[in-house]
Amino acid sequence: MSALDSAGAAAAAGQAATAVDRVADAVRAEILTGTLSADAPLREEAAAARYGVSRHTVRAAFQRLVAERLAVAMPYRGVRVASFDRETIIALQQLRAALEVEAVRIAGDRFGPEWPELVLGPARDALDRLAASADWLEAERVHAEFHHALVAASGSTRIIEAHAALGAELLLFLLHVRPHYTLESLVAEHRVLLDEVQSRGPDALRDHLEHSTRLLVGG
């Protein structure tokens, strides 16, 4: 293959990747805003026509959403928006507790009851941006960043990486819990949490997660 052919192939691959990103981003946003409800079908042909791309591109975009657990591929039913049912909620919150509570415990061992500003800064910044969020989709992203910042305080690379892998599932959680909050109450609750993870340690984070779980599943 000539250098010109190689350059052309690379450009084509880049364009295909960009198209996949564009479709995945658009459908992801519709899922995370609730425009596409749980169990809604994601149809390749309709999406290809809507976004002006090939069905192959749409298929790759849908596969990305499946990998993010925002969609599920089901035999004979195709790809559908993931259901956020009781079992899914409890499993997600148990995993979050395993990671976030342990991260706060480690941070407490590192810093004691007063974490340094260098560590608190990213969480405080996230709270300020959460308060200034223009819409709930932005709030979902910043809420996730706040919890990532708490986990990062542990300094544990493996825990930080595992928590980051929750990705879009954490955004989806706030979509479902947000009917129980105003933006103001969400910010206020997390400001208190930032103080209490220092003074009370992992118990504060555990209580926070259990409270939000009860909002969705009761008990």
Feature-to-residue mapping (PLM):
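Amphipathic coiled-coil alpha-helices
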Residues: L99, P122-A126, D135, V142-A149, ...
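Amphipathic alpha-helical dimerization/coiled-coil segments
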Residues: E100-R129
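Hydrophobic, amphipathic alpha-helical faces that serve as interaction scaffolds
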Residues: L95-G108, A144-Y181
